[in-house]
Amino acid sequence: MSAIKLDGNLYRDEIFEDLKGRVNSLREKGIVPGLATVLVGDDPASHAYVRMKHKDCEIVGVKSIRKDLPADVTQEELLAVIDDLNADPECTGYIVQLPLPKHLDENAVLERIDPAKDADGLHPVNLGKLVLNEPAPLPCTPNGAIHLLRRFGVELDGKKVVVIGRGVTVGRPIGLMLTRRSENSTVTLCHTGTRDLAAETREADVIVAAAGKAHMLTADMVKQGAAILDVGVSRVDGKLLGDVHPDVWDVAGAVSPNPGGVGPLTRAFLIRNVVERAERA
């Protein structure tokens, strides 16, 4: 195992120290930032993610509000909870934990969120602002991934980046963010319709694996010294696995572990979105 470990936990702790000071300053002014989560159903992974988010709130000093709903909640009942959070002055920002059960209209739920309270940065208005390069809450996982690369000195300017996966939470927005002038990367977005994935990845300086297919990126698909971000998650035989095969560590120059790589920064930038909105209020 020769690759540098892109340890998200180390960087998360640095971000949390900064946020603690900012939250204390807000509290001195009588402002208490509040993060709410909306969780539908009993998926163990989703419950684990939400627990970690609320633990992070406790560490930083942000008020946490939790809305847990049964798996058979109706669309109308879920939208009513969204409306309540939109109107709640104690809720600075919130997220709806995805994915939702299949009987619920995910897009309609996301559209119902007040864009100003969209802590995940996934509301259509905020994604549109990302396209236009206007200020808005940024999607947390792509933002965390890019900051992780920066923190460890991985060069992006002019580099070829291959993104595997075209989902709305990672693949599509990270492609937009990497082509901003601040990153200035050349991005190839690969997906199930890509004819020769390995031919694309072998040319990449940086690979973002966000397909949700366990161990699909193998060493023979990676050029020597490339930086690899493992963002995808799959459940196999009761275990959570990333998209990157362990043999990639012997070829790559830097790899984010999964868990412990991008995930901690996803949560850190979620809280930062909430704190920044409180600072603007």
UniProtKB/Swiss-Prot annotation:
The keyword Oxidoreductase applies. CDD domains: NAD_bind_m-THF_DH_Cyclohyd (cd01080). SUPFAM superfamilies: Aminoacid dehydrogenase-like, N-terminal domain (SSF53223), NAD(P)-binding Rossmann-fold domains (SSF51735). The keyword Hydrolase applies. Keywords: Amino-acid biosynthesis, Histidine biosynthesis, Hydrolase, Methionine biosynthesis, Multifunctional enzyme, NADP, One-carbon metabolism, Oxidoreductase, Purine biosynthesis. Its EC number is 1.5.1.5, 3.5.4.9. Homodimer. Pfam families: THF_DHG_CYH (PF00763), THF_DHG_CYH_C (PF02882). This is Bifunctional protein FolD. One of its GO terms (biological process) is L-histidine biosynthetic process. Belongs to the tetrahydrofolate dehydrogenase/cyclohydrolase family. GO terms for molecular function: methenyltetrahydrofolate cyclohydrolase activity; methylenetetrahydrofolate dehydrogenase (NADP+) activity. Pathway: One-carbon metabolism; tetrahydrofolate interconversion. It catalyses: (6R)-5,10-methylene-5,6,7,8-tetrahydrofolate + NADP(+) = (6R)-5,10-methenyltetrahydrofolate + NADPH; (6R)-5,10-methenyltetrahydrofolate + H2O = (6R)-10-formyltetrahydrofolate + H(+). Catalyzes the oxidation of 5,10-methylenetetrahydrofolate to 5,10-methenyltetrahydrofolate and then the hydrolysis of 5,10-methenyltetrahydrofolate to 10-formyltetrahydrofolate. Coiled coil: none annotated. GO terms for cellular component: cytosol. PANTHER family: C-1-TETRAHYDROFOLATE SYNTHASE, CYTOPLASMIC, C-1-TETRAHYDROFOLATE SYNTHASE, CYTOPLASMIC-RELATED. NADP(+) binds at residues 165-167, 192, 233. Transmembrane segments: none annotated.
